Amino acid sequence: MAELVYTPVIELFQLVWKGLDIQFQFEGQENLPTKGGAVIASNHVSYLDFAFIGTGAIHTKRFIRFMAKKSAFDNKIAGPLLRGMKHISVDRENGNASFVTALKALRAGEVVGIFPEATISQSFEIKGMKSGAVRLAIGAQVPIIPTVIWGSQRIWTKGVPRDFRRKSVPIHIAYGPPIFLAKDADVESAEIDLKKQMVSMLHKLQESYPDSHVGERWAPQRLGGTAPAPAIEG
């Protein structure tokens, strides 16, 4: 079925990335499935994470349906685009409805993107994660693709003015090997294992990042940056 909204939006994003001279580096793209359902579980450091992560999946010719807050769908400009791209609205007062919608999409062979932290991490460390990604993967019996992104927070993140004038920002994204969970898998244990995997992947991305983190607002204190500490971030 033709994607009347998603396809032109992707093409527009690609023009924007070219104009900003984004320096993409993708790792593990071979782990992205070319068919069948899958859960993309990613850390969250920027308002543009979904667009960058989707860019890395273009070669698979798959369209990731991201789960996003209901408030984004209520926006007069973003709302129609999000609905047209078949992203999934998450109403925190009725979370079960969005879970069921995502589950149906996965069982129909769609790729669903989710940020288990639920909100942007202002410390840029991976915070406590909710169990949605694990429960969806178990319920639909599809793999989880652990994913991490680094650098996108330098353009537009929570609590810091966006800067679309910044050019040639390195944005690194890694897609990990698929994680398959049995129907009777323990959700809590699987969630802990997923977080450990994502933290390890993120640290590796940060170690290979070409720009220094020292003294930078977009970098965590662990790396010498000046972002809020995890315990006090708003």
Each model region followed by its residue ranges:
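Helix-adjacent hinge/juxtasegments
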Residues: 87-93, 97-109
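Membrane-interfacial terminal anchoring regions of lipid-handling membrane enzymes
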Residues: 1-18, 23-34, 104-107, 166, ...
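Catalytic core of membrane glycerolipid acyltransferases/transacylases, capturing the structured
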Residues: 33-94
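Catalytic-site beta-strand/loop segments enriched in glycine and acidic/polar residues
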Residues: 105-133
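Hydrophobic/aromatic ligand-binding patch that stacks against planar heteroaromatic rings
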Residues: 56, 81, 104, 135-139
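A cross-family acyltransferase "interaction/gating" segment
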Residues: 124-186, 220-221, 228-229
